[in-house]
Amino acid sequence: MKVTVLDSIDAIERDEWDALVGTEYPFLRHAFLSLAENTGSVSPDAGWTPRHLVLRQDGRLRAALPLYEKNHSWGEFVFDWAWANAYNQAGFDYYPKLVSAVPFTPAPSARLLRARADDTDAAEILIAAATELAVDTDCSSLHVLFPDENDVPLLEDAGLILRKDCQFHWHNRGYETFDVFLATFTSAKRKKAKRDRRRVAENGISFRRVRGSDFDGDTWSMVYALIARTFMMRGSLPYFNQAFFEGLGRELPDNILAIIAEQDDQPIAAAVFFESDTALYGRYWGSDGHYDALHFETCYYQGIDYCIETGKQRFEPGTQGEHKVARGFVPATTWSAHWLAHPEFANAIERYLDEEGRHIDRYMDAVDAHTPYKAGEDET
């Protein structure tokens, strides 16, 4: 067996990589990672140096780990700025560090990619190789962000420190229509959701869906301009550039969906989603101004509508946002796993994460008490 470090995802054949990924997580596909690298959003100049690990046995690809060497903590959605500050104050370098993640994509998915799901030996070899690489390259630490529930116990068994967090997800309980879904709400919460949707309709706003295969350059230019405007209104630039978005339509046409809001036949807002056969993932949002309840409608209600129509089992709209709860999303635990070379810092962070995890548990319990569902209808 041999573990190799790749300095680009293009150093491995697309079909080989995708055979490990499967179809559930489109943003783990070779095309997504390749576009991110080749359009410049993920590159050494941007602080993301690819260090992907592949494990081969007799020439056959057995397992892989998406991995990057980073000199900052932007685009991760698992916040370790305080750790970096503590290192700096103690006279140590926190950067570079190794991060296993999908860049700018806070969606739980497999990290320890294996040809056979039960190949725990391969997972252990990858984890050991990643920590060894961290030592060999003078990285302070290894961070595995948003692993799925199958990876978490393997990472814990390998000695990584687990960190718990919370997102809000929607689950399809076999709803035939949106109204059937709303019927599971209490009366007051159902009225609020209907009022949200009514406000948008009363403003003369309509919606259309565009699949990746139907996008052209003009459509992507319009969607990207809306997304970029919203990012810049918040004082930042989009994580990905327009070339990346245009590439998605070409390379992943069956996995991309945009919902475009229009008023007087003019586009005023757009949300971009990824989809698999079973799930919808909300990723990017933009508008040309403020419209009452439009964000809720475009990013949440329209997505739920689409899931019900297509029979998707769950909808993950992105990070943070307690406002999602009133729209039918419920708390879901997410994880990250961390290895730090410095033993004293590792011990201190482990103690901190133990307390943080208890706080997250209390927070999720409190949120559970305020979901909009009737007694007996709650999704938790």
Would you name each region that the model predicts?
Residues 1-380:
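N-acyltransferase acceptor-side catalytic subdomain
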